[in-house]
Amino acid sequence: MAGKIKKGALVRVVREKLENSLEATASDTRFPSYLFESKGEIVDMNDEYALLRFYTPTPNVWLRIDQLELVE
């Protein structure tokens, strides 16, 4: 599925993959609910990460592509 994820796609964050990640152990694990309950748009990408914009007044966030799933 990660091969289908591209710039401009709408995605959701997979809670289990984010909460059990190395990045989660290095930061506050009280993730805001909008990460899991709303769609995010990919605004930029590199090899392993995607920059997500959520339609809430929050900063964009970089997450690993394997922590995302496409919204259909």
Swiss-Prot record:
Keyword Cell cycle in record: no
Keywords, sorted A to Z: Membrane, NAD, NADP, Plastoquinone, Quinone, Thylakoid, Translocase, Transport
Localization in the cell: Cellular thylakoid membrane
UniProt KW Translocase keyword: yes
Reactions catalysed according to its record: a plastoquinone + NADH + (n+1) H(+)(in) = a plastoquinol + NAD(+) + n H(+)(out); a plastoquinone + NADPH + (n+1) H(+)(in) = a plastoquinol + NADP(+) + n H(+)(out)
EC number from the UniProt entry: 7.1.1.-
Superkingdom of origin organism: Bacteria
Membrane topology: Peripheral membrane protein
Quaternary structure note: NDH-1 can be composed of about 15 different subunits; different subcomplexes with different compositions have been identified which probably have different functions.
Known role: NDH-1 shuttles electrons from an unknown electron donor, via FMN and iron-sulfur (Fe-S) centers, to quinones in the respiratory and/or the photosynthetic chain. The immediate electron acceptor for the enzyme in this species is believed to be plastoquinone. Couples the redox reaction to proton translocation, and thus conserves the redox energy in a proton gradient. Cyanobacterial NDH-1 also plays a role in inorganic carbon-concentration.
Protein name: NAD(P)H-quinone oxidoreductase subunit O
Native source species: Gloeothece citriformis (strain PCC 7424)
